[in-house]
C-alpha cells in the first residue's frame, strides 16, 4: 500500500527424510567370543543431533544441503586434516609407508617377488572384475583394510596420549579382570579384525560404515591430539562405529540395543562415550563424497601394499547382464528423482532411452 512494497517469498520445501523403524539384532554370545584371547568388544550407538535453524531474507531461496553434499571451502590448506579435505593425505597411509618400504627392501635383498603368481590381469580378450566399488565395497576386504589402518595407527603412534573416556582400564568392556600386562603390547591385526568383524556382523552393517568409522577415527586423532594405543583402541573404534551407524543408517538405532551386546556397560556409559566423541570432533559428522572416495582408494592402496587382494571374477555374459541391470536401476533412480523435483527435460528422456548395454 502507498509507497511501501512488500514481497512474499515461498521457499521450496526441503526434502523430507524418511525414517524407518528397525532394531539391532543382538548377538551377545558372538561378541564375547570375538577376539580369541583378546579382550571382547562392544558395539556402537549414536546420538541425536538437533538440526540448526535456517534463516533467510526475502529474495533468497531456502536451499539446505544434505549432510553428504557439504563440501569444504577451497581455501583450506593442503596440510589440513584428511578427514575434512580430500587433497590431504590420509594419516594411516603415511604411517604405513615405513613398513612398506622395509618390506620392499627385504624382498629385494632376498630376491623375493612381491607379486602374487596367481594374480590375474585383464587383457583385450578377457576382463577380470572384483565386487568392490566405492559405492558398494567388498565387506571382508574393507574390514581387513580398515583394521589394518587402525593397526598402523597403533604401531606407528608418536606417543601414548589418551583421554579417560577411552581408557579401557577405567571403563572396561567386560567384567573379567584384565592384567596390566595386556595393555603393554600392541594388538595384532587379526585381533583388531575379529573385534570389528564381530561388531559388524552383530549390528548388520555394510562396508560403507567401516570407511566412515575410519574417517571419524582420524578426525578424532587430529582434533583431540591423541594417539591410538593398546589402552584405548577398542573404545575409540566402538565410539566411531557407534556414531557412524547412528548418523548414516536408515534404521532406527538405540543405545539400549547395543548395551545388550556387552557384559559391563550401561546406557548411561554408552551415552557418555557418544557425547564425548561428538564433542571431541566438534560435532563434525559430515563426510563429503570426495573425502569418502579418498579414503576408499587409499584403503585399496594399503591393501595392495600389504598383499591383500579382492577376489576377481571373469566378466562373462551373465555378469555383464547383471552390471547392465544395476546400471539401469541407477538410471531409473535419477529419472524418477528428476521427475519428482520437476527438473526433467526432453534431453533426459532421450539419454535414458539411448542407454547402451554391454556388447560382446
UniProtKB/Swiss-Prot annotation:
Q: Does the keyword Membrane apply?
A: no
| Cyclin N-terminal domain span | 204-286
* InterPro entries documented for this protein: Cyclin-like_dom, Cyclin-like_sf, Cyclin_PHO80-like, Cyclin_Y
- Where does the signal sequence lie? none
Write the record's keywords in alphabetical order, separated by commas.
Cyclin
Which GO terms of the molecular function aspect are on file? protein kinase binding
SMART domains the record matches: CYCLIN
Q: Which family does it belong to?
A: Belongs to the cyclin family. Cyclin Y subfamily.
* Name by which UniProt lists this protein: Cyclin-Y-like protein 2
Give the organism, scientific name: Macaca fascicularis (Crab-eating macaque)
Gene that this sequence comes from: CCNYL2
Amino acid at each position: 500500500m502507498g509507497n511501501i512494497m512488500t514481497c512474499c517469498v515461498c521457499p521450496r520445501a526441503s526434502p523430507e527424510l524418511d525414517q524407518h523403524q528397525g532394531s539391532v539384532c543382538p548377538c551377545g554370545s558372538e561378541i564375547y567370543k570375538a577376539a580369541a584371547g583378546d579382550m571382547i568388544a562392544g558395539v556402537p550407538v549414536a546420538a541425536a543431533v538437533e538440526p540448526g535453524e535456517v534463516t533467510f531474507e526475502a529474495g533468497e531461496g531456502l536451499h539446505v544441503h544434505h549432510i553428504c553434499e557439504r563440501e569444504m571451502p577451497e581455501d583450506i590448506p593442503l596440510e589440513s586434516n584428511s578427514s575434512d579435505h580430500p587433497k590431504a593425505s590420509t594419516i594411516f597411509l603415511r604411517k604405513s609407508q615405513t613398513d612398506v618400504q622395509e618390506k620392499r627392501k627385504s624382498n629385494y635383498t632376498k630376491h623375493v617377488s612381491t607379486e602374487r603368481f596367481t594374480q590375474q590381469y585383464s587383457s583385450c580378450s578377457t576382463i577380470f572384475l572384483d565386487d568392490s566399488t566405492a559405492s558398494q565395497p567388498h565387506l571382508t576386504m574393507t574390514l581387513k583394510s580398515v583394521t589394518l589402518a587402525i593397526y598402523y595407527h597403533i604401531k606407528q603412534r608418536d606417543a601414548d596420549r589418551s583421554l579417560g573416556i577411552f581408557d579401557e582400564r577405567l571403563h572396561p568392556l567386560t567384567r573379567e579382570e584384565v592384567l596390566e600386562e595386556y595393555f603393554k603390547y600392541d594388538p595384532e591385526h587379526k585381533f583388531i579384525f575379529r573385534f570389528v568383524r564381530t561388531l559388524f556382523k552383530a549390528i548388520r552393517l555394510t562396508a560403507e560404515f567401516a570407511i566412515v568409522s575410519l574417517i571419524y577415527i582420524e578426525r578424532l586423532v587430529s582434533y583431540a591430539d591423541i594417539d591410538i594405543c593398546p589402552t584405548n583402541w577398542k573404545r575409540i573404534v566402538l565410539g566411531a562405529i557407534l556414531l557412524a551407524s547412528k548418523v548414516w543408517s536408515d534404521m532406527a538405532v538405540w543405545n539400549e540395543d547395543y548395551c545388550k551386546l556387552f557384559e559391563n556397560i550401561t546406557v548411561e556409559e554408552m551415552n557418555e562415550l557418544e557425547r564425548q566423541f561428538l564433542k571431541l570432533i566438534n560435532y563434525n559428522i559430515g563426510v563429503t563424497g570426495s573425502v569418502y572416495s579418498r579414503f576408499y582408494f587409499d584403503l585399496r592402496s594399503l591393501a595392495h601394499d600389504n598383499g591383500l587382494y579382492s577376489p576377481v571374477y571373469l566378466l562373462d555374459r551373465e555378469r555383464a547382464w547383471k552390471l547392465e541391470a544395476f546400471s539401469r536401476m541407477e538410471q531409473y533412480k535419477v529419472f524418477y528423482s528428476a521427475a519428482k523435483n520437476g527438473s526433467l527435460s526432453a534431453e533426459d528422456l532421450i539419454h535414458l532411452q539411448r542407454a547402451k548395454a554391454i556388447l560382446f
